[in-house]
Amino acid sequence: MYLYNLTLQRPTSVYQSISGNFSGTKQVEIVLNHGRSLELIRYDENGKMQSVLYTEVFGIVRSIIPFRLTSGTKDYIIVGSDSGRVVILEYNSQKNQFDKIHQETFGRSGCRRIVPGQYLAVDPKGRAFMIGAIEKQKLVYILNRDSSANLTISSPLEAHKSNTIVFSMCGVDVGFDNPIFATISVDYTEEDSSSGGGGGGSIEEMMDEDIGKKKKLLTYYELDLGLNNVVRKWSDQVDDSANIVMTVPGGTEGPGGVLVASEDYIVYRNQDHAEVRSRIPRRYGSDPNKGVLIISHSSHKQKGMFFFLVQSEHGDLYKITLDYQGDQVSEVNVNYFDTIVLANCLTVLKNGFLFAASEFGDHTLYFFKSIGDEEEEGQAKRLEDKDGHLWFTPRNSCGTKMEELKNLEPTSHLSSLSPIIDFKVLDLVREENPQLYSLCGTGLNSSLKVLRHGLSVTTITTANLPGVPSGIWTVPKSTSPNAIDQTDKYIVVSFVGTTSVLSVGDTIQENHESGILETTTTLLVKSMGDDAIIQVFPTGFRHIKSDLRINEWRAPGRKTIVRASANQSQLAIALSGGEIIYFELDQASNLIEIIKKDLRRDIACIEISPIPKGRNMARFIAVSDWEGPIRVLSLDRDNCLGQVSMLDTDKVYIESLSIIEMQLNEMGIETKKSQSQTGQTTTTTTSTSSASSSVTSGGSLFLFVGLKNGVVKRATLDSVTGELSDIRTRLLGRKPVKLFKVKVRGSNAMLALSSRVWLNYINQGKLDIVPLSIEPLENASNLSSEQSAESIVATSENKIIIFSIDKLGDLFNQETIKLNATPKRFIIHPQTSYIIILETETNYNTDNIDIDKINEQSEKLLLEKQKELQQEMDIDDDDQNNNNEIEPFKKLFKPKAGKGKWKSYIKIMDPITHESLESLMLEDGEAGFSVCTCSFGESGEIFLVVGCVTDMVLNPKSHKSAHLNLYRFIDGGKKLELLYKTEVEEPVYAMAQFQGKLVCGVGKSIRIYDMGKKKLLRKCETKNLPNTIVNIHSLGDRLVVGDIQESIHFIKYKRSENMLYVFADDLAPRWMTSSVMLDYDTVAGADKFGNIFVLRLPLLISDEVEEDPTGTKLKFESGTLNGAPHKLDHIANFFVGDTVTTLNKTSLVVGGPEVILYTTISGAIGALIPFTSREDVDFFSTLEMNMRSDCLPLCGRDHLAYRSYYFPVKNIIDGDLCEQFSTLNYQKQLSISEELSRSPSEVIKKLEEIRSQKLL
């Protein structure tokens, strides 16, 4: 078995974000660290985010930080990864890629505690940076320029300190003095010696004990630029809970030094400066016995002002400012700012935005409505209690509608699936194409997300029409690219026998003064020349000038016009009988007839190419009769309407043609452009001339062909010779394909209308074709208005629809259904198709907990706050308004209930309406961990079984009781009725239906239960499994069981003996997270370290187990070292780079092959595609081997070592690496493709086909 790995959905979790001017312009950009990839984000003035570049690094990115050289104009990126190397990246805006500027090796590969890469700190002036490990090692590199002004890096300078654990690191702003770096660390030398010198467990032992015994230190490391060495300049003790150190602007911009964040306090520290301490305010309802801890931070600096924005573990944002004079700080001011969802990282941008990379859920870009200066300075002090704690009432906590944000306003979101807890591919709403159902998030951010392949759209307006239109067009106010007003003025809708003209403004109204003939069917409306309009109808055409003067041309004789096409200077019409007449605009902006040509066959389609840059006329026209072929004709005067190339369609009827220019960064176009500009020519292949010709037109010309059978063909049209090459085919639907040109992100795009609506557009330099989540359309046109600069107007039956496309670049659009608590599992009712979700929350506030007993001090302060508000506002004590203001916070901000406190729900949901039919809450303290439906015996009635635990404590693990709850579906499956509970000894994490009974994993035992009158009856059991059972699959008489620590076990059930026998297991111990049966002998599994593997039972063993004539073979077989008597064969292995949470065997294409679909905790969705031919295996294996040597990973990690992180990669080809082929320069593409005996275009075509035909 050979598999091909492809990523469908990129990782959506963001572990770190940085901002800077990476492209060298003044535009602020954001770089996101997704753990295994980097992404560059830009946003417009409206705060809408757009992904500019996404790149896999084929390694684990541990940290990133930006820096700018002194007097530089652009920012660079320093990356710390698992490669044992430090890498400096530069964003190349011309090629839209990250270029590796420097790569320095300093240690071993892997995420090790003593290998630097976990922490990065940069001197604020860009002169040096420090890279540090969790323990011991710290290296300093000096940054400089060479004689050519290129960035250079020095040899590393060591700043190691043994037996030291680092918690945080930053650069200290000292102006242009010797660079200084600050760290928060703790020395565990005494702890290490007291434990006997054991190096392996010293950190863990120290963390488990009271850290107060060991003093945390703030240490300054100075880089002496003269002596070229690093010394520890200063060290002082800080709070034991200190966890973050932040740089304070220095020199002429501030006092310098650092801020240290610890539990309950923000402290200003600097050498030769007294400590200045400020208490962090607390929210109402928080536990007074637990301090406030800062988890993320950012800062903003501008001329004459700077401030810090930090976030607590509750989601509260605090603004920190300093009162200082010179280099002396007198006070640290910490004021409540706003409350948002918990963020892994905060990034304050220079132009008034805040990016919050959420820990779980969507990431948000906020606009600063204000920076909190108008907050009363004495507000916090006025709420100070006798212990010195400061209290405040939070706003908009975690997305609840308590009170709107005061200082921030969300402007844009990046969708995130992280973490994916459970995942299934189903077609519950009968849409033909399956939907992807995902349980995501935790706590208040929990949701069920329904993913559909395609881009989401926003419908702006919909209106009914008097009939079914035959076409729709828009007319701009001005065709000049320099025009101030680029909006459209008319929407023209054609019906049978009539035409309607609509004016575009604040409202859309009918217009009768446009000069357009309204008493006929319109075939084409197009802007031409100096704001003129051409209208083509069956009997002729009208040329309407900007001053409404009309020139009309009539078709000769009894002939009628059947097809027409035009650009801004040319018009071609096709008459009945097969005659083509070609017109051009003269210098007086009048249309003059140039030539006629009779093709002697009825014309089905005609299309004129766009006008290239630097020319006045287009050079080619494409025409076709109904059965093809498609002919490309020249429009040059010396060979006007002469054939230059041809495309065969195998006599399939043609529906539409379109020629469009797109800026495609593929097949080494940039290299060929540079060669063309220097006069070099290359004629190796047809694709070479195609790439070089794009220089003339500013982009690549593509001919799209829509066929009657629902297939679209795409060919590259050479803008010099007119030759067609690189032909690609895609099935879009069941109906004929109509093609319409639109604008997306200011660039040309193509809308293909079939049984689904598809969009062809350029995404990060590549041509993507994705469906739109909208009803089938029949006609479409681009529309620009004051309300929406880029929208589309279309018709569907007798309706007109105006819509815009959201979130370009996404592969799936999402529909979110909010949940009450953290989801655990969901299943589908086999008869009603209802979705059954099990939600379980630990440390949860249950309704019977008395808040006054838990947090009397917080409640007292609430009442005091209420009295103060009443006195200030002159409101009586019995006024209900003030009570309404305070009461919701008492309910929302109750303290955590503590360990062993759980709340669980069983929710039944309609998959079509998303209505919650039942939300059954389990008893207080009862936690549900597993769920399945089961039909006992031959009755056919479906029951629901839930594995529950009461008062469970996770660490150390303990529980009061465990049981199986059996529920009956009532009211047509919409409600649940509890029948009884069955006590078990250990928690049940996995269960399944098995031959009319229930099989479940009770601790490390496998049990089979049957239904009884008062409880489930134990029928069979085996205790021969090592630890805890987390997965169970049944097929025939076999059970495939996943152990939490010991991989996969095959179990045989002997019905005659009513016995279970473990007869095969894995050789390697694996910490299982998910598994799926591929066939009777094969299983795919995943572990928590990111490995996906395939195991197979040897055929000989499988036959022996099934054909045991004595019936006693399994009974007397025994393995060695407590293992099974037989071992599974290791078929395939692959390291994904992230913890895999689910595996599914499914088909994503109707009638397509089955694939293994996997999801990760970071929100990524990937697929393993089985190969069906040896030829494909050889092709992709050779391609992968060449890509490993010619496309080195961005962060210096060896690709083969990365994919073999824990086990050697076997029989799985990395499709993500193979798809990097299109980013290589042309010479590398050519050398690799020659080894494959193909051209570069054929290699890219092969890569596209395996994704489109077998996945989406």
Swiss-Prot record:
Q: Domain of life, per the record?
A: Eukaryota
Its predominant location is nucleus
Keyword Iron-sulfur appears in the UniProt entry: no
Which stretches does UniProt call biased (Low complexity)? 674-696
Q: Which UniProt keywords apply?
A: mRNA processing, mRNA splicing, Nucleus, Spliceosome
Keyword Protein biosynthesis part of the UniProt annotation: no
Q: Which GO terms describe its cellular component?
A: nucleus; spliceosomal complex; U2 snRNP; U2-type precatalytic spliceosome
Cross-referenced Pfam families, in alphabetical order?
Beta-prop_RSE1_1st, Beta-prop_RSE1_2nd, CPSF_A
> How does this chain assemble?
Identified in the spliceosome A complex; remains associated with the spliceosome throughout the splicing process. Component of the spliceosome B complex. Identified in the spliceosome C complex. Identified in the spliceosome E complex. Component of the U11/U12 snRNPs that are part of the U12-type spliceosome. Component of splicing factor SF3B complex which is composed of at least eight subunits. SF3B associates with the splicing factor SF3A and a 12S RNA unit to form the U2 small nuclear ribonucleoproteins complex (U2 snRNP).
Which family, according to UniProt?
Answer: Belongs to the RSE1 family.
Q: What is the protein name stated in its UniProt record?
A: Probable splicing factor 3B subunit 3
Q: Which organism is it from?
A: Dictyostelium discoideum
Gene encoding this chain? sf3b3
